[in-house]
Each structure stands twice: as C-alpha cells, then as structure tokens.
C-alpha cells in the first residue's frame, strides 16, 4: 500500500488553478483585497479540480499512542492520561472535541499504540503494540512497525473518503510525544537541540534540561539513516507520528485537503513531504503553535501559519478553527458576484493589474 501511495500522488490541477484565479480576480472587489481567503480558494480548486467547493463534511483524525520515553520523566502528565483523554475525545469533552462541535466537525479517533488492553467504544483499534520502546535506551520500533503506522494513517484517509469527508485535520494524543517529535525534527533537519525542544505540556526546569539532553543523545545513538524518514520514525519517533504522517500522504493520494495543527502535526507533515514533495500542496496550515520547534518545521515545509492565537494544546485543536476560515474562502468563491454580475464597469482595473497598489471602492 505505502509504495503505491508514494508513487500515485499527483500535483495540483494547474489548469483549474488558473481558472480559479481568473474567477477570483473577476469578483467585485479590489484585486487581492481578500488576501489569504483568495489563496485558499484557489488552491482548494487545484486540489479538487472543481471551481466551486464546499467543506460541509469535516473531520479531524486523531492518532493516540503511548511513548516509552515517558518513563524518563520528560512529560508533565502520567502515561495513563493518553487513554483517559482518548476516552474524552469520544465523550466530546476535550479541547479539540468542544471546538469541533462548534462548527460541525467530526472526530475519528484511532488507537495505534495505547499502553492498555482496554477497548474503548467509538475508538478505531489499530494498535501496533502497547506503546513504543524507550528511545533513550533503544529504537522506538522496528522498521516494519514504522511502515505499518504510516499505512494505518493512509487507511484512515480511505475510510474518511468513503464516509464523504471533504476536508481533514490531523491531531494526536500521546504523553511524551513532544519529545519524540523534537527528536524526529532534529534528525530531519540537523538543527540545534535548543531549537526544537520546548516544555510541551509544562515541565519544570530540571525535566526540561533532561528532555534536551535526551533528544540530543538519541539522535546520535541509534545509527539513524537521516535520508530515510521511515527510519527516523522507527528510531526516535512514535506510532502516533507515523500514523499522522500516513494521513498526510493519504490526503495527497486521495486528493482531500488536509489541515496541519501544531508542532507534532507539522513534524508529521514534514515527514510526509520528505517522502513525496508534492504532499505540501494539499496541506493548509491552521495556527502558529507556541511550541518552539513549530517555527523551524513550518519554515522547512515552506508554509505560513494561517493564524496566531498563542495556542499550544495539540490534539488537532487548531484544525476546526482553520476549517471555519476555509469555509469563508469557499463562501467567497461560491457566492460573491463578479463585476459583470454586479453590473460594475471594471475597466479601471486595467491600469493597476500589474502594479502594487490598492483601490478603495
């Protein structure tokens, strides 16, 4: 499945992008005056191949898994919180769940590696094992397990497509996963440890220093093939990160627009884009995460955050917010009149199309 997807991803529909841009420029407004909404609408058309789109059926896919490195004391919460919060996703009481309910967004929650035998009703069970190994002592998983995590993410998109979802978000739950994400990002781009390690959910200074030391050491000790994103996941990543990477790959393959949440989500998007550089064309950002490594990762991906709300929750919480903005972009494209439809003579625009200036109607 994985190789088929990697080879089967095609780029945006450039003919439709040109048509969509011409449509946007013909709308009864000063050129470019709706800013990023115009860019969003145009790229959405390039993804779907349709001039007019709607995202009335929305879903955040959440990958839950435990990380063995938690036993090193790098997280503020105990490991049992992964299972508890996964249950709360289903109850609708977490941050992402309450935001999602406000604009009709559904959640699709997967157990890819929670350290528990408990079966949670409403959670899709794709458990690879009960948590990864402690990356401070040994590789997180085997190479085959890493590939399996990616394929679970791809399968999740296939399920979402069959259910009729028109836009996806990518979230997670896994105590310790800011540590694994920081290690993955450091391995991917070769940066300083201090540039990628933050305090995650909130840890004291001693734990923070330990977290930085662990990330520094694990990237050196496991004989990582830095040119192979799957090997990076297997050595220092997590099942959650791998499955999220698969969601981004699947979204590009099935041509469904997909929204990046925060730090862990953007690291997964970057991994997917390293596996196939067309992936980022299908990605929309949401918010600028306050977790320190986010800025490096989004810059490496070549995208800009849509919003800056001082958020750092994770879970996919930024995705429903971005869905609303994307909804506004589709409303503009679908419902706004052109100059011709509004009986407005737009000949005055000919003098300014190639100049950097603004016109107030």
Curated annotation (Swiss-Prot):
Q: Which residues act catalytically here?
A: 315 (proton acceptor)
Q: What Gene Ontology terms describe what this protein does at the molecular function level?
A: nicotinate-nucleotide-dimethylbenzimidazole phosphoribosyltransferase activity
The reaction(s) catalysed by this protein are:
5,6-dimethylbenzimidazole + nicotinate beta-D-ribonucleotide = alpha-ribazole 5'-phosphate + nicotinate + H(+)
Q: Part of which pathway?
A: Nucleoside biosynthesis; alpha-ribazole biosynthesis; alpha-ribazole from 5,6-dimethylbenzimidazole: step 1/2
Which segments of the protein form a coiled coil according to its record? none
Q: Which GO terms describe its biological process?
A: cobalamin biosynthetic process
Q: Which InterPro entries match?
A: Nict_dMeBzImd_PRibTrfase (IPR003200), Nict_dMeBzImd_PRibTrfase_bact (IPR017846), Nict_dMeBzImd_PRibTrfase_N (IPR023195), Nict_dMeBzImd_PRibTrfase_sf (IPR036087)
Read off the Pfam families from this record.
DBI_PRT (PF02277)
Q: Which UniProt keywords apply?
A: Cobalamin biosynthesis, Glycosyltransferase, Transferase
EC no.?
A: 2.4.2.21
Where are the bilayer-spanning segments?
Answer: none
Output the HAMAP family linked to this UniProt entry.
Answer: CobT
The record's listing under PANTHER family reads: NICOTINATE-NUCLEOTIDE--DIMETHYLBENZIMIDAZOLE PHOSPHORIBOSYLTRANSFERASE
Q: What does this chain do?
A: Catalyzes the synthesis of alpha-ribazole-5'-phosphate from nicotinate mononucleotide (NAMN) and 5,6-dimethylbenzimidazole (DMB).
Q: Which NCBIfam families match?
A: cobT_DBIPRT, PRK00105.1
Q: Which family does it belong to?
A: Belongs to the CobT family.
> What name goes with this protein?
Nicotinate-nucleotide--dimethylbenzimidazole phosphoribosyltransferase
Species this protein is from: Clostridium perfringens (strain ATCC 13124 / DSM 756 / JCM 1290 / NCIMB 6125 / NCTC 8237 / Type A)
Its lineage reads: Bacteria, Bacillati, Bacillota, Clostridia, Eubacteriales
Instruction: Provide the gene name from the record.
Output: cobT
């Amino acid at each position: 499945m994985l190789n088929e997807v990697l080879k089967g991803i095609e780029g945006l529909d450039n003919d439709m992008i040109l048509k969509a841009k011409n449509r946007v420029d013909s709308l009864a407004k000063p050129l470019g005056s709706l800013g990023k909404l115009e860019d969003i609408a145009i790229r959405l058309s390039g993804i779907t191949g349709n001039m007019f789109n709607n995202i009335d059926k929305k879903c955040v896919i959440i990958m839950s898994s435990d990380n063995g490195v938690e036993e090193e004391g790098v997280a503020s919460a105990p490991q049992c919180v992964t299972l508890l919060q996964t249950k709360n996703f289903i109850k609708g009481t977490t941050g992402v769940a309450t935001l999602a309910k406000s604009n009709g967004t559904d959640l699709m929650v997967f157990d890819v590696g929670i350290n528990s035998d408990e079966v949670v009703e409403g959670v899709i069970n794709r458990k690879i094992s009960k948590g990864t190994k402690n990356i401070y002592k040994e590789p997180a998983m085997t190479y085959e397990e890493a590939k399996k995590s990616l394929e679970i993410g791809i399968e999740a998109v296939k399920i979402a497509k069959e259910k009729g979802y028109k836009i996806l978000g990518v979230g997670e739950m896994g105590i310790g996963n800011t540590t694994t994400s920081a290690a993955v990002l450091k391995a991917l781009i070769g940066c300083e440890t201090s540039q990628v390690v933050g305090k995650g959910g909130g840890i004291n200074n001693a734990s923070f220093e330990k977290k930085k030391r662990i990330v520094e050491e694990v990237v050196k000790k496991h004989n990582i093939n830095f040119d192979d994103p799957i090997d990076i996941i297997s050595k220092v990543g997590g099942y959650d990160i791998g499955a999220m990477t698969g969601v981004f790959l699947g979204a590009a393959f099935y041509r469904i627009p997909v929204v990046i949440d925060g730090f862990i989500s953007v690291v997964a998007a970057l991994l997917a884009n390293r596996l196939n550089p067309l992936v980022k064309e299908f990605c929309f950002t949401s918010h600028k995460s306050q977790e320190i490594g986010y800025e490096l990762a989004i810059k490496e991906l070549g995208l800009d955050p849509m919003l800056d709300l001082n958020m750092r929750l994770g879970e996919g919480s930024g995705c429903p917010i971005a869905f609303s903005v994307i909804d506004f972009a589709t409303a503009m494209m679908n419902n706004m009149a052109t100059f011709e439809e509004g009986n407005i003579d737009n000949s005055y625009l000919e003098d300014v199309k190639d100049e950097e200036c603004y016109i107030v109607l």
